[in-house]
Curated annotation (Swiss-Prot):
Domain of life: Bacteria
GO biological process: sporulation resulting in formation of a cellular spore
Protein name: Putative cytochrome bd menaquinol oxidase subunit II
Keywords: Cell membrane, Membrane, Sporulation, Transmembrane, Transmembrane helix
Gene Ontology CC annotation, any one: plasma membrane
Family: Belongs to the cytochrome ubiquinol oxidase subunit 2 family.
Phylogenetic lineage: Bacteria, Bacillati, Bacillota, Bacilli, Bacillales
Keyword Iron-sulfur tagged: no
Entry's transmembrane regions: 7-27, 63-83, 87-107, 119-139, 164-184, 201-221, 236-256, 269-289, 312-332
Major site of localization recorded for this protein: membrane
UniProt membrane topology term: Multi-pass membrane protein
Length: 346
């Protein structure tokens, strides 16, 4: 099935939003979890490192989930109707958990019950990725039933699907892996050796487990969504390239780090390699998923908006990007690159 250039641009924009949100959100949610885990180990300052990352980033992360919903609704109204109908309950759960987490993050820096609030924030941040990831297996087919023109999500099939559980495990471990890798880099810049060792160790543990869950996804996908599995096997070179970058990241964590005491590992190099790895893997998955948005009911073309509407929306997105990009760059430079902030220097 051929896909028009306009539809391909639109789906690429949405997939770009999804990828950016997935990476940022996993780091954000994971940082909240690690902040909770190391809360009672004040001598390590691991919680302080996590909070320095969380403080400015969770608000920005929430912006991208709004952008995904708006882009999906505007570019693909046909797909939005089906997804909105079947994901009403899980979507409401996600919004509730995001609201709870955001509220507790706001008050966690001021309230006397700081520990309790951070526990709640950390736990909710641990659950949200597990629910969010279920959108992917739902689009693979087999879980949506149509009765008298009404779409329904068969929850019993989801909770009995090995592929769905593989996705859940992958989401949780990826959250812990990416966040621990980022916080190791933060600790490296902040020159907090105890925190760096803790987060590096966590990355070395959670990384291979997340890869194992990725393998489980492929194995279970072969039985439950063979059309998608076959598509990914046709572009197996992208998966191989993804695995190579994962190995590079692992090697980077064992390279000598002369600029940081006697510690080993180059977390910045590892973080960049893992970012490339997830991009390559997501590209292979997205390419194989075409032309379906929701198999087999909704394709990219059947759910696409009118061409004239797309052109107007696309122009609007370009203008919005031009306006917002300087703000995101300023944010990155102030909080991600400013060593005075990371080290909490006066």
């Amino acid at each position: 099935m051929e896909i028009s250039t306009d539809a391909l641009i639109a789906i690429s924009i949405i997939w770009g939003f999804v990828f950016i949100y997935a990476v940022m959100a996993t780091m954000d949610f994971g940082a909240g979890f690690w902040s909770m885990i190391y809360l009672n180990k004040e001598h390590m300052k691991a919680t302080d490192i996590a909070n320095r990352f969380l403080s400015p980033t969770w608000e920005v992360t929430n912006v991208f989930i709004v952008a995904i919903v708006v882009a999906l609704f505007s570019f693909f109204p046909g797909a939005t109707f089906v997804l909105g109908t079947v994901l009403l309950i899980p979507g409401s759960m996600i919004l509730l958990l995001l609201a709870i987490r955001s509220g507790f993050l706001v008050f966690s820096n001021t309230a006397k019950e700081r520990k309790t609030l951070r526990y709640i924030s950390g736990i909710s941040g641990f659950i949200i990725p597990a629910i969010l990831i279920l959108v992917l297996p739902v689009t693979h087919g087999g879980f949506i039933e149509k009765t008298d023109g009404i779409y329904n999500l068969n929850m019993s099939k989801i909770f009995s699907s090995p592929n769905a559980y593989s996705f859940i495990g992958f989401a949780i471990l990826s959250t812990l892996f990416l966040s621990s890798l980022l916080l190791a880099d933060f600790s490296n810049v902040a020159e907090e050796q105890d925190a760096y060792r803790a987060y590096r160790k966590s990355a070395l543990i959670t990384g291979p487990i997340s890869l194992l869950f990725a393998v489980c996804i492929m194995v279970t996908m072969r039985n439950e969504a063979n059309w998608l599995y076959s598509g990914m096997m046709n572009d197996f070179s992208w998966i191989i390239a993804s695995f190579i970058t994962f190995v590079i990241a692992g090697i980077a964590l064992f390279l000598p780090n002369k600029s940081f005491g006697q510690n080993i590992g180059k977390p910045r190099l590892a973080l960049v390699a893992i970012g490339i790895q997830y991009f390559l893997a997501s590209y292979a998955y997205g390419r194989a998923h075409l032309p379906y948005m929701i198999y087999p009911d909704v394709t990219v073309m059947s759910g696409f908006t009118e061409p004239a509407t797309f052109r107007a929306l696309f122009a609007t997105y370009i203008v919005a990007f031009i306006i917002l990009f300087p703000g995101f760059f300023f944010f990155w430079k102030m909080f991600m690159r400013d060593k005075r902030y990371i080290r909490q220097e006066e």
